[in-house]
Amino acid sequence: NSPIGVLWRLDDLDIPNPNHFAIAGTTGGPVSVINNKYLSNSDFFTGAFPAEYGNATAGVFDLRMRKGNDEQYEFSGQLGFLGTELFAEGPLRADKKSSFLVSYRYSTLQLFESFNIQIGTQAVPQYQDAAFKLHFPTKNGSISVFGIGGISNIDILVSDFESAEDLELYGDSDRDQYFGTSLAAGGVSYGHRLGSKAFGKLTLAYTWQDNHADHVLVNRDSSFAITSMVPNMGYFYRDQ
């Protein structure tokens, strides 16, 4: 078995790897795009999957977004190491019990950089993500519009260093590295009760994922001066 075979699912939609700085072909990453503030439930299966998870080979992470508060408005903000985030939810029309939910997060370290606050490295991880859900009850079911998305980039530039003493622990000492990922997933779903013992659901959705990496070799002479910079490796991966 392998973590590469894990299936991620959000509101019955199979989604790409929902992590920032994810490597193409993997299912994990250092910072999750998912925020637990808008989840109602999550199930993790390691084997003996139900038939609905037919494409899974190693594991399943099934996530459910909750609907927003349909009675009153709520707003919150948070500043933490993993991100600075804003969250809002509330009724669209109180008499109809419809609701909205929206979340946004921005890299705290990137925010520090914009204020010229040094964090100990010039390779600052830059990322942001957002999510939303609109919920509309109907006579025999409901309509939901939902989506998540995230963008992340990091540049490790050893060519900016003027001496060997300036080199950091991060990355390789002989090359500039550029790495980035982005993803989006969303859709519209309609659920309808078919009598007292049956329920049907139709979902129209779209998913998109993009990963790229580039390495540039930095050649120097004995005085640490740059003599040449040579593209060494690069890849671009897109799944939609």
Predicted features by range, described:
Residues N1-P3, D11-L13, G47, R66-G68, ...:
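Solvent-exposed coil/turn segments that connect beta secondary-structure elements
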Residues G29, L39, A56-A58, Q72, ...:
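Transmembrane beta-barrel architecture of outer-membrane proteins
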Residues L13-F44, A130:
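Short acidic/polar hinge/loop motifs at secondary-structure boundaries
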Residues G5, P30-S76, E85:
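A beta-strand signature from Gram-negative outer-membrane beta-barrel systems
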